[in-house]
């Protein structure tokens, strides 16, 4: 799932690097149909398990990717879902998959310049996307989310986090720099939400669960290498294998973390 500030330059960076058409399809191979975020459908079901919505509910998915989250929410609850992603190529793919469903909308836009009415959404949801935003723009986004939520609304997020920066080694620093991520601790993330006036802030370090998901995905990749190579190159396989090996290593040594955050407007 993707979003990032500075629409023109960073949109180009993402579409030409991590989220090329082929890159998106490679991610979907390992995450599962309609997903390019950790755990695919299984994690989505778990994370949404205590959320109550209905057919009249309105949901915003920030960094909606291929749309798996919106599709699941619409299927489970019948809710209206609006996905925003900065990458036009990904949004085009997502829209092709929901053609004819007028309760699911995918839009290519920069969430930091997009505006919605106040008190508009019952749920604002984001999966592994806000890592692309600078600290300043994380704050800006959460202020907008607070405004957009209905008084009874809920904010629900998973995102990449990290240990304190003084503990980062050169390898991890290079990874974060190359991806243009801004990673903070789980505790710092929760503090930002509190500072943006959210109430009942719940933060959890789900890194152990994330590591389990990574192990399953890594195993799936190797068990299905022959099928993968019918679709993609050996170079892509090596790159994906290396990426998952690194994330598994960094999660086990508590360098990279996976945060869960839930908060309410009132």
Swiss-Prot record:
GO MF annotations, alphabetized: phosphoethanolamine N-methyltransferase activity
Induction: Transcription is down-regulated by choline. Proteasomal degradation is promoted by choline.
Name of the top EC class for this enzyme: transferase
GO cellular component, one term: Golgi apparatus
Transmembrane region(s): none
Active site: 19, 132
Mutagenesis / variant outcome for changing residue 179 to A: Abolishes activity
Recorded phenotype for the gene knockout or disruption: Lack of phosphoethanolamine N-methyltransferase activity and disruption of phosphocholine synthesis from phosphoethanolamine. Growth and morphological defects in trophozoites and schizonts. Lower levels of parasitemia in the intraerythrocytic culture. Reduced number of nuclei in the majority of schizonts. Reduced viability of intraerythrocytic parasites. Reduced gametocyte production. Defects in gametocyte maturation resulting in the absence of stage-IV and -V gametocytes. Lack of oocyst development in mosquitoes.
Cellular localization per UniProt: Golgi apparatus membrane; Cytoplasm
First-listed, main subcellular location of the protein, grouped into a coarse class: Golgi
Regulation of its function: Inhibited by phosphocholine. Inhibited by hexadecylphosphocholine (miltefosine). Inhibited by S-adenosyl-l-homocysteine. Weakly inhibited in vitro by amodiaquine, chloroquine and primaquine. Inhibited by NSC-158011.
UniProt-listed Enzyme Commission number(s): 2.1.1.103
Gene3D superfamilies linked to this entry: Vaccinia Virus protein VP39
Catalytically driven reaction(s): phosphoethanolamine + S-adenosyl-L-methionine = N-methylethanolamine phosphate + S-adenosyl-L-homocysteine + H(+); N-methylethanolamine phosphate + S-adenosyl-L-methionine = N,N-dimethylethanolamine phosphate + S-adenosyl-L-homocysteine + H(+); N,N-dimethylethanolamine phosphate + S-adenosyl-L-methionine = phosphocholine + S-adenosyl-L-homocysteine + H(+)
Family the entry assigns: Belongs to the class I-like SAM-binding methyltransferase superfamily. PEAMT family.
Protein name: Phosphoethanolamine N-methyltransferase
Native organism: Plasmodium falciparum (isolate 3D7)
